[in-house]
Design a protein with these regions (language model features):
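Structural signal for interior beta-strand "rungs" in well-ordered beta-sheet cores
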Residues: 152-154, 158-253, 389-390, 395-489, ...
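Phosphopantetheine-dependent thiolation modules in NRPS/PKS and related acyl-activating systems
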Residues: 1-24
Length: 735
């Protein structure tokens, strides 16, 4: 029964009452909008976090200015080295960043206990504010990545010896990791989520020698037993017994009693000096963008070399931003290529100690490419992407379309005509018992890997096959088969044989037209760099009134820059793509290319200057409305991933959790199909979930974490559903 309608019919046939309603009915009242007072509090938190971000970058700007003054840039101001040293220590070292985040969390969350609290109440906003502060100070940045175990302990978590932790700990400190546990990248350990008017928060426990797969989520109260394995992309709601393998959303015993690939029966020697190596490497990796951007920085600084008044150099500096942007992107791309290629030397399939040269190289590769797909976003989902992936070392066939894929290049093979959608994960490493396992992953010819889909080490997406949105490639599969969900189940699908010029066989002139549009993706990057120049000049101007004024008013500058970025992005959307309607468009069409151009403004301009920091805040809904979304009063929205905002309706009091995608388009056989998505009054879409086009979540209905609402499904009013794909959820289980 793969669809809600079929499930409902089956349930109705077994019971006299309408079981599709009764089995999952939720007696709680329809949630009200987030109160105005709470929204005002959030705006205050936004100002504090903006001031913190501004203070960090103010220190960088004044440090550069002081150095340049000593090198002969007479117009540059000088600042006390004592002030700069303290600022750099607090704002730009892992000890300072993590230490300050821990201090704020410990003070604000003192006395917090597991339980259910009001949405947007004191407890909820305290947790949300601490998370926003941690992001603002850089405690969760690349620089701090190797310090996550220390971060967890300082927050109050119980962490045993020999733990490998490649994810961010919860600011609540409600975490227990037994000795030898392994946490893979992008695991959600937050231990909280919003449902209707309730905020659930609880302790998360991972016993000794257990492992949690990438992109999994552990809900409040989740407990993973000793030696248990939770497969990638799973959602743990309760207890996973010791020694068992569980998979899926919600997680359940896996049919694969034995995980693919034998693991060593002993732990590797864990040389302590590798801890220092990883710590230093994290700092060095955070400087890769700066190293790549150095030639561009030199270009931007040239006009201010011989001026008497720094402000007089601003017009010439802004005029150089297009050239500097191109030079900077090329420089960073070259740095990424060199790092990734060097780190591929000696990497072979099999098991490697986490604390070893090969393990270190694999970790560097994935972290670097994760950073690259953010900073080099314009080259993804373009005609350049296959060439870029080949340069990185992946085996990529002809006619491949790839978006923001994260992969281990030396272990990846992508066949001719394959399609990899947004945020796909290919050949990522596995962790267990101090070991890191890597293996080859393959995406077959004309295969499709959907949004946030995963093809793990040793797996493949079959030729002419499909792995759907938020789904994992199976252990074994035959050509032409399609798979949905976690764990994956076979999906009936009728594939088209179309190979016309608008799908698989574009004419040369279509390639030229698309290339011309893709060149325009540099425009939002230029705008972002120009905005950075303006902010830097504003910081220098503020510093002339004294450091206290600069520190206090810097947040106003950052908020102003964010407002400009948001407005320019909205204007660009309406100029480029205008209002989007329910429709279909082939891949090789102007609509698809222009839609990607508009999205580049979102990711490269609005994202870093506004949207990343605004998620959950009332300001994010104001901006999304300006993009065309219909959003009611008091909506709690922790995502900006509404790809075609015109097609989204979020009614009063609805909640959209962190990491969610309100997916209003799908590519089926290289044809983009767009339709509406609606969340009714007080409806909930839990964290890390995806809702597909033409779907509706009814009034007061709740879809739990890590769930997939399929295309065209209508979740009944006042009911609870969860899973990938969704199924009825016991109304007594509010974990």
């Amino acid at each position: 029964h793969p669809r809600l309608g079929a499930q409902a019919a089956m349930l109705d046939s077994r019971h006299d009452a309408p079981a599709s309603q009764a089995a999952v009915s939720d007696p709680r009242p329809v949630p009200s909008p987030v109160p105005i007072g709470a929204q005002v509090t959030q705006l205050g938190i936004d100002v504090v976090c903006a001031t913190v971000r501004a203070a960090r970058w103010l220190v960088v700007v004044l440090t550069l200015a002081t150095v340049l003054h000593g090198l002969g840039w007479g117009a540059m101001p000088r600042t006390s080295w004592a002030f700069l040293a303290v600022g750099l220590l607090v704002g730009w070292t892992p000890v300072g960043q993590i230490g300050l985040s821990v201090l704020v969390s410990r003070v604000c969350l003192r006395g917090l206990r597991p339980g259910t609290y009001p949405r947007a109440g004191r407890v909820h906003l305290s947790v949300w504010g601490c998370e926003k502060f941690a992001e603002s100070i850089g405690a969760t940045s690349m620089m701090s990545a190797p310090w996550m175990l220390n971060y967890a302990r300082w927050l109050g978590a119980s962490v045993g010896r020999g733990v490998d932790m490649h994810a961010v700990p919860p600011v609540t400190g409600m975490l227990t990791l037994g000795g030898g546990a392994a946490i893979e990248p992008e695991v959600d350990l937050s231990g909280h989520w919003v449902e209707g008017e309730e905020f659930h928060v609880g302790h998360v426990r991972v016993a000794s020698h257990a492992s949690i797969g990438a992109r999994s989520i552990l809900l409040p109260g989740a407990s993973v037993g000793k030696g248990a394995v939770v497969s990638a992309g799973s959602a743990v709601h309760g207890l996973v017994p010791a020694g068992q393998v569980w998979a899926g959303s919600p997680a359940s015993p896996s049919s694969a009693r034995k995980v693919v690939g034998e693991w060593p029966d002993h732990r590797p020697v864990r040389a302590r000096w590798w801890v220092a190596v990883y710590a230093v490497t994290g700092i060095l990796l955070s400087f890769l963008p700066i190293i790549g951007f150095l030639p561009a920085l030199w270009l931007l600084l040239r006009p201010s070399r011989d001026v008497d008044v720094l402000g007089s150099a601003l017009p010439a500096t802004l005029a150089l931003t297009p050239l500097a942007t191109i030079v900077g992107m090329l420089g960073f791309a070259l740095v990424v290529l060199v790092v990734v290629r060097l780190c591929a030397i000696g990497v072979r399939e099999g098991h490697h100690a986490v604390r070893s040269r090969v393990g270190w190289q694999i970790w560097i590769t994935e972290r670097t490419l994760d950073m690259a797909r953010t900073l080099l976003f314009p080259i993804y989902a373009s005609q350049l992407t296959p060439w870029w992936l080949r340069l990185l070392g992946a085996d990529v066939g002809r006619g491949v379309e790839a978006s923001t894929v994260l992969l281990l290049p030396c272990m990846t093979k992508i066949g001719d005509g394959a399609f990899l959608a947004d945020d796909t994960l290919v050949a990522s490493y596995d962790l267990r018992g101090g070991w890191m396992r890597v293996g080859r992953a393959r995406v077959g010819k004309r295969a499709f890997l959907g949004n946030s889909g995963m093809a793990a080490a040793g797996r493949k997406v079959p030729k002419d096959g499909l792995v759907a949105v938020l789904s994992a490639a199976p252990h074994k599969s035959k050509s032409g088969t399609s798979w949905l969900g976690s764990p994956p189940v076979k999906l009936r699908r009728i594939a088209t044989e179309s190979v016309d010029e608008r799908t698989y066989s574009p004419t040369p002139i279509l390639r030229v037209y698309r290339g011309l549009v893709e060149v325009c993706r540099l425009v939002p990057v230029v705008c972002s760099v120009a905005l950075g120049v303006l902010v830097a000049y504003a910081f220098v101007a503020l510093a002339a009134f004294g450091l206290p004024a600069a520190l206090l008013l810097g947040g106003v500058v950052v908020l102003g820059a964010g407002a400009i970025a948001a407005v320019v992005t909205s204007l660009a959307k309406w100029l480029i793509i205008r209002r989007i309607a329910v429709s279909e468009h082939p891949l090789w069409s102007a609509f698809v290319w222009l839609n990607e151009l508009s999205d580049t403004f979102v990711e490269m301009l609005a994202g870093p200057w506004f949207a990343w920091a605004a998620t959950g805040s009332p300001t994010i809904t104001v901006w999304l409305r300006s993009l065309g979304a219909r959003i009611g009063r008091g909506v709690w929205c922790e995502t900006y991933w509404l790809p075609e905002a015109d097609l989204v309706r979020l009614a009063d009091g609805a909640s959209v959790g962190r990491g969610c995608v309100v997916q209003t388009h799908l590519f089926h056989d290289r044809v983009m199909s767009l339709d509406t998505v609606t969340l009714g009054v007080g409806a909930t879409l839990g964290p890390n979930s995806v809702v597909l086009p033409a779907a509706r979540i009814g009034t007061g209905a709740s879809v739990g974490p890590a769930s997939l609402v399929l295309r065209g499904e209508d979740v009944p009013d006042g009911t609870r559903w969860v899973g990938n794909p969704i199924a009825p959820w016991d109304s007594d289980d509010h974990a």
